[in-house]
Design a protein with these regions (language model features):
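Transmembrane alpha-helix interface/packing and boundary motifs in multi-pass membrane proteins
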Residues: 22-40, 120
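Hydrophobic alpha-helical transmembrane bundles that constitute the permease/transmembrane domains
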Residues: 33, 125-129, 149, 153-157
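Residue-level signal for transmembrane alpha-helical positions in Major Facilitator Superfamily
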Residues: 35, 39, 127, 158, ...
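Short amphipathic helix-loop junctions that connect adjacent transmembrane helices
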Residues: 40-48
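Transmembrane alpha-helical segments of integral membrane proteins
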Residues: 156-169
Length: 204
């Protein structure tokens, strides 16, 4: 399945160039199974080969990232914090989440919104998800777009640049991104366990 997806991604970039990169990055933001660790390094390889330029590929990928992030932001903003709070009040107990937990999360995001968006765009698995709390909290659109663009440019430059440097060995980028993803998963797991332990102790 992943092999077929990778082949399709490469075919889109071969056919459409930078436009294909932008479209794929939009999809990657709203449909996570499309992996940026394939899209971006391969785009760098294509540019290094002479079918485009690295700068144009980075620009196209950043445009795609901003558009994709804006889609998720818009969906979350339409749902809004009121519906989210109502959902937590009604169903939160099934997930071990209380309205006060949501309130603390909202307050944390409000304090750290800039860092969350800027740095989150450089972290695998978090890159797309960070647009959702920004939308729920209805973060001001101009700063959201600005910091999304800056963070996305850094990520895109790193992966496209690596693909351009490695040339026909661009696939060597993927294992390193996979390691970073597992680190993120491990950190999330630790936070979830810590949250659960704290809740259990409070109930005891």
């Amino acid at each position: 399945m992943l092999g077929d997806l990778a082949s399709w991604v490469q075919d889109v970039i071969e056919r459409l160039g930078a436009v294909g990169v932008a479209l794929l990055v939009i999809l990657e933001n709203v449909f996570p199974p499309i992996p940026s660790e394939i899209v971006l390094p391969f785009a760098g390889f294509v540019a290094q080969r002479g079918d485009g330029s690295v700068v144009v590929m980075i620009f196209a990928a950043t445009i795609g990232a901003v558009v994709g992030a804006l889609i998720l932001y818009g969906i979350a903003a339409v749902i809004g914090p009121e519906r989210l709070r109502a959902f937590v009040v009604r169903f939160g107990r099934w997930f071990g989440v209380k309205p006060t937990d949501l309130q603390r999360a909202e307050e944390w995001f409000d304090r750290h919104a800039v860092a969350a968006v800027l740095l989150g765009r450089c972290v695998p698995l978090i890159r797309s998800v960070v647009s959702v709390p920004a939308g729920f909290r209805r973060m001001r659109l101009a700063p959201f777009l600005l910091y999304t663009a800056i963070g996305s440019t850094a990520w895109n430059t790193a992966l496209i640049g690596a693909g351009a440097v490695l040339g026909n060995q661009w696939e060597r980028v993927e294992p390193y991104v996979a390691i970073l993803q597992w680190v993120v998963v491990a950190l999330i797991a630790v936070l979830v366990v810590r949250f659960a332990v704290v809740r259990i102790r409070r109930r005891a």
